[in-house]
Amino acid sequence: MNDEMITGKLMNALRGDERYEVIESLDNSEIRGANVVSVGVDETAQANVGLPDYRSRVSVYVSSHVSEDDTGQSFKDICQEVMRRLEKYTLQEAPLSSLFEEVPVVGFFFDRSKMMTVDDTYGKCYLAHLEYTVITSF
């Protein structure tokens, strides 16, 4: 339940830009497509034994087909926009409650990013994997 709530809140924060579509990654895997941003919780584990806090690893994937974006500029712009929308929360410039609302999040951190070009059934894709950590306390 909490994983779905976290995913939903992040998806809402990323929606509203006509350049890309935001979808949920149900099987916690990368989803490739033309200007697609997918969000999913990879795993959740107890952060501190004996305390009601949990650490969730969240993946945000950004993908774009090379055939539709030969310079990669659209892909780069979408990646920058996705990171910009979440950065104010990871840098604590905005309260976490304004992003996660009723979900009791006490920490939100950007962990790492990885960008690559991959081949799939539709041809070459640009792919970015942005990884975040969410700490909740219930």
Give residue spans per PLM region.
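Charged, often glycine-rich, active-site loop that binds/positions anionic groups
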Residues: 33-42
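Charged, amphipathic alpha-helical segments and their flanking helix caps
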Residues: 1-25, 29, 42-138
